[in-house]
Amino acid sequence: MKSKEDNTQKKTKKLSSKELSWVLYDVGNSAYTLLACALIPIWHKSLAVGDGAGQISSDRATAYYAVAIAVMTVVSALIGPVCGAIADHMRIKKAIFSTTVVVGVSACILNGFTPTWVLFLVIYVLTKIFYNASLVFYDSMLVDVTTKDRMDEVSSYGYAWGYLGSCVPFLVSLAAYICGPDMLGYISNRLSMIIGFAVTGIWWFVVTIPLFKSYKQVNYVSDAADKDIHKNFENDVFIRDNIKEKNKTNKNPGVLRLIADAVAQIFGTIKKIATKDKKVGLFLVAFFLYIDGVGTIIDNCINIGTDLKLDSVGQVVFLLFTQIVACIGSLVFGRLSQTYKTTTLLYVCIAGYFAVCLYALTLHDLIGFGIMAFGVGCFQGSLQALSRSYFSKIIPPENSGEYFGIYDIFAKGASFLGSLVIAAVKLAGGTINVAVATMAIFFAVGFVFLRLADRYDAPRHENN
């Protein structure tokens, strides 16, 4: 537990204007996340499946959609660390962040006007790539907008407001879908899509405006700091030559050299994590395991209901219910972070998810599905928020973009291994209940690695 003096200091502070502006971006991007989870797959199939020219079967549509997600995941994982490292070097994080948001929002709105399923998937992948890139910069901004003792609470506010705020544009999008040809038939499928994507894109952009205006990058890598970071890796030809080239001039480097410098720094950081920053390395392993379990459950929630032949409308209602519970859960754990260590709360969240996985063995009706949704909501946002804030505390703030780029690789892997496990269980003849229950292994092993990270000597920049 933390000292009473620390608790008193934290309780006397409300969200500052910078913290509030940062939190609002979660409200914007979460709207797109919810749309992508609930309606985009449906709209994709409405364009792809049929007997018309260029249309395909439902199974092939599902397969192509999965391929699109895989492509998006790989590209996002590759460019994330490079984008973060460039922003750290050049003190231009705000400019690059703004660019990713504007392109992402524009692509989101354009998605509603696509006439074919192929173009729909191409624009969807483009939107998701820029959306994911924006999150690298956004997460790394946490070290600039607040202090270390408030990171848990501010990060939790971001997820909480995001879960709640995302329901507003989603309800409009859902109403447009209900009025479409699949249900009431009042409007065309094209108009339903245009409304859904446009409302989400506009919402995403408008709530980001305060962050555009208020954010200032405080932590960044100077030339001197950059040399210090690489001094232990000068035996590497690529890094050594890059440093020599950089020292020839004080002018801003060109784009290609900037990218080369960023790649060199990433290799140096990976070496540093492996050899010196082992606390960060152990946490990243733990994070990859338990967040993979989280992502798998989220991505397969509709499949769970479908396999159990549950009412589709009831599933959507419980999806919204989960958003509200996740909002409350994030706020509760944010308050608890004033009293308890971040790692203690992470243990609770991981244990909670472990219990949810075991509960899946008893799941057989819509009520049980709702109980499981409640359990997921209690810990979903809290686990994500506390992981983000804990990582912010144990990394050097001037390299936050670069470190969060690496963090993003692990986050983007969420549901990769878990989905393979679920597929293997299903192909072997197992039920969806058993498949979800196997996710408990990911949380158990992740718990062990988090314990190892927690016990490891903290680096100088940690203040947990």
Task: Map each language-model feature to its residues.
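Glycine-rich segments within core transmembrane alpha-helices of 12-TM secondary carriers
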Residues: 155-177, 408-418
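Helix-to-loop junctions at the C-terminal end of transmembrane segments
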Residues: 78-91, 328-341, 426
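Helix-loop boundary and gating motifs at the non-cytosolic
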Residues: 13-73, 279-318
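Juxtamembrane intracellular "pre-TM" segments in multi-pass secondary transporters
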Residues: 6-19, 217-284
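A membrane-interface helix-boundary motif in multi-pass transporters
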Residues: 56-59, 177-202, 424-443
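Helix-loop junctions at membrane interfaces in 12-TM secondary transporters
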Residues: 112-124, 361-372
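Multi-pass alpha-helical transporter architecture, strongest
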Residues: 203-214, 437-464
